[in-house]
């Protein structure tokens, strides 16, 4: 697997769970002999939703909710077959979305 790169993008609502998952991936890749670049923090997506508090009147009374999506990027340079096998067996939390590109 020479001259290849694995790019892993992680997304989660909870930044602590995201950082724990990123450190697990980095430790696993380094333990199997691959070079790792990252985790690189990407910009946080922030979505704000404004709704009326009452169901009928009072347009002045509103409530705002926000949803933040935190993201990290990890590049694994020159992965070995042992690295790919270890990453496939890695157990990560359910709240983290993982996108892998070769």
From Swiss-Prot:
PANTHER family from the UniProt entry: 30S RIBOSOMAL PROTEIN S10 FAMILY MEMBER
Gene Ontology CC terms, in alphabetical order: ribonucleoprotein complex; ribosome
Gene Ontology biological-process annotations: translation
Protein task: Involved in the binding of tRNA to the ribosomes.
Protein's recorded name: Small ribosomal subunit protein uS10
Translocase in keyword set: no
A UniProt-annotated Pfam family: Ribosomal_S10
UniProt keyword terms in alphabetical order: Ribonucleoprotein, Ribosomal protein
Oligomer and partners: Part of the 30S ribosomal subunit.
NCBIfam families: PRK00596.1, rpsJ_bact
Source domain of life: Bacteria
Classification via InterPro entries: Ribosomal_uS10, Ribosomal_uS10_CS, Ribosomal_uS10_dom, Ribosomal_uS10_dom_sf
Protein family per UniProt: Belongs to the universal ribosomal protein uS10 family.
Claim: Signal is one of the keywords in the record: no
Matching SUPFAM superfamilies: Ribosomal protein S10 (SSF54999)
Molecular function in Gene Ontology: structural constituent of ribosome; tRNA binding
């Amino acid at each position: 697997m020479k001259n290849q790169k694995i790019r892993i993008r992680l997304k989660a609502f909870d930044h602590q769970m995201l950082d724990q998952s990123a450190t697990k991936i980095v430790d696993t890749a380094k333990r199997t002999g691959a070079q790792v670049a990252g985790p690189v923090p990407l910009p946080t997506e922030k979505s704000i939703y404004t709704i009326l508090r009452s169901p009928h009147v009072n347009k002045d009374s509103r409530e705002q909710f926000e949803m933040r999506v935190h993201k990290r990027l990890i590049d694994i340079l020159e992965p070995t077959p042992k690295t790919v096998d270890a990453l496939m067996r890695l157990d990560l939390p359910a709240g983290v979305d993982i996108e892998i590109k070769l």
